């Protein structure tokens, strides 16, 4: 189901003032994410497509409102523009994110985004050798995301197997004369379905001041122009997060006395003990950036402005941010570590004293978890671009040619990839990259 509409109204208040208002609304409610597995056979070079098979709902619903107002004033020596924009987005997504009939995990994501922007510019009127534009830009966005993840019974069984592989299931203590004591700890998750709630608020502020000047007929050379642009950009990101989940599990320790490999006595060293932990992250992150972005260009027009050659240099910037999808990974690691620590502590407290040191020696210590900031934050991307090109009009305008060569150097390049947990896509910095290119086009008029 989908629907929407758009209204636009233009009012010429006078010869010098123009008001352009528009509003649009879009609504969609649909099923979604028909993913399936593709099996490729190397020898036959054939592909087999598995059927689409889900056990949970997959759908998407979105409500989107956009409004804008453009005010233009033609003064004697300049043109004034003020562009105001507002956007409201409210959506809900259900995704069976294992894409199989098994009950692994499903994601529900509810987003509410409100953003407002304002750009005010003053620019010169055409016809003079000095053409300029000066402006101020402001932007604010508040995004509120509620994204609980449900882990079903099949993935809980998998977690149990992982926990079993992380603890010693049989600690053998030789006792001489063919006798041995076998200490067998056991950890079993009893929570049938785990609900990992996730609430994230990410306000973003951006302010920029910019100016661009273009000088025509530079040094009194007709057709030669130079462009200089500067943009001072300030951005601030915040994220308020509250996400986590409790889990119930049992810990027990059994013992077996053996002689020459045969069990002669079973001992309950620690009765089944229920435990509960909660892995949760709650707090705030904040980061701000300030950048000066220059642009330089030199162009020479000839043949009555029909042909030109040019060179340009500019710096680009893509802001950083936060991947809230990474919290699922952190919570899984934290659950594993805390389960190991609590299990070890309970065994040491309740098992017979003569065996606690042995258990303490063989039980694994908790692994290291990446810092929250390092795990969820990605850095801004910076790019320097260089381009040399020409436009030629040949054979009386019957053949138009464009040729350009370019080079781009990017630092902290941002790429999109699936999170390790499989719960959504994340943005990650991939390091540095260089791009070289050649672009050519021909347009012929055969009339």
Question: Where on the chain are the PLM-derived regions?
Answer:
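Residues on the lipid-exposed face of transmembrane beta-strands in outer-membrane beta-barrel proteins
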Residues: 7-11, 69-73, 118-124, 209-215, ...
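Outer-membrane beta-barrel and related beta-rich outer-membrane complex signature
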Residues: 20-45, 49-51, 86, 92-100, ...
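Transmembrane beta-barrel strands of outer-membrane/channel proteins
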Residues: 21-25, 84-86, 134-140, 228-234, ...
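Membrane-embedded beta-barrel scaffold of Gram-negative outer-membrane proteins
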Residues: 70-95, 308-312, 325, 334-428, ...
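Transmembrane beta-barrel wall of Gram-negative outer-membrane proteins
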Residues: 1-30, 63-69, 114, 118, ...
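Outer-membrane beta-barrel channels and translocator barrels
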Residues: 12-16, 75-78, 125-129, 218-221, ...
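Extracellular loop and loop/strand-boundary signature of outer-membrane beta-barrel proteins
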Residues: 52-57, 103-108, 117, 194-200, ...
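Signature of Gram-negative outer-membrane beta-barrel scaffolds
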Residues: 138-304, 340-344, 359-371
């Amino acid at each position: 189901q989908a629907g929407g509409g758009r209204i636009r109204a233009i009012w010429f208040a006078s010869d010098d003032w123009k008001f352009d208002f528009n509003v649009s609304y879009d609504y969609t409610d649909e099923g979604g994410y028909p993913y399936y597995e593709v099996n490729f056979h190397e020898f036959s070079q054939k592909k087999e497509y598995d059927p689409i098979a889900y056990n949970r709902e997959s759908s998407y619903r979105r409500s989107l409102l956009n409004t804008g107002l453009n005010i233009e004033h033609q003064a004697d020596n300049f043109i004034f523009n003020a562009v105001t924009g507002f956007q409201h987005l409210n959506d809900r997504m259900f995704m069976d994110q294992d894409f199989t009939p098994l009950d692994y995990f499903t994601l529900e994501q509810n987003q509410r985004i409100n953003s407002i922007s304002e750009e005010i510019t003053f620019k010169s009127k055409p016809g003079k050798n000095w053409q300029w534009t000066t402006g101020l830009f402001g932007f604010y966005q508040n995004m509120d995301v509620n994204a609980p993840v449900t882990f079903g019974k099949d993935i809980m069984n998998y977690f149990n197997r992982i926990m079993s592989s992380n603890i010693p299931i049989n600690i053998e203590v030789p006792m001489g004369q063919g006798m041995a004591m076998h200490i067998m700890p056991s950890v079993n998750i009893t929570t049938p379905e785990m609900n990992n709630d996730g609430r994230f608020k990410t306000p973003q502020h951006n302010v920029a001041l910019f100016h661009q000047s273009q000088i025509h007929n530079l040094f009194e050379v007709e057709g030669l122009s130079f462009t200089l642009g500067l943009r001072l950009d300030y951005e601030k990101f915040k994220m308020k997060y509250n996400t986590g989940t409790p889990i119930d599990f049992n810990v027990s320790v059994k013992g077996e006395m053996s002689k020459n490999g045969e069990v002669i006595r079973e001992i309950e060293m620690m009765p089944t003990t229920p435990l509960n932990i909660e892995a949760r992250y709650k707090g705030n992150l904040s980061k701000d950036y300030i950048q000066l972005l220059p642009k330089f260009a030199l162009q020479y027009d000839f043949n009555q402005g029909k042909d030109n050659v040019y060179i340009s240099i500019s710096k680009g910037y893509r802001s950083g941010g936060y991947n809230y999808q990474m919290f699922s990974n952190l919570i899984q690691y934290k659950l594993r570590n805390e389960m190991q620590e609590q299990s070890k502590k309970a065994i040491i407290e309740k098992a017979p004293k003569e065996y606690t040191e042995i258990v303490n020696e063989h039980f694994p210590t908790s692994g290291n978890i990446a810092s929250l900031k390092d795990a969820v934050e990605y850095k801004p991307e910076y790019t320097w671009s260089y381009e040399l090109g020409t436009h030629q009009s040949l054979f009386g305008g019957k053949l138009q040619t464009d040729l350009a060569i370019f080079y781009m150097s990017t630092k902290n390049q941002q790429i999109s990839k699936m999170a390790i947990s499989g719960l959504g896509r994340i943005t990650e910095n991939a390091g540095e990259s260089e791009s070289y290119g050649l672009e050519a086009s021909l347009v012929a008029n055969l009339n």
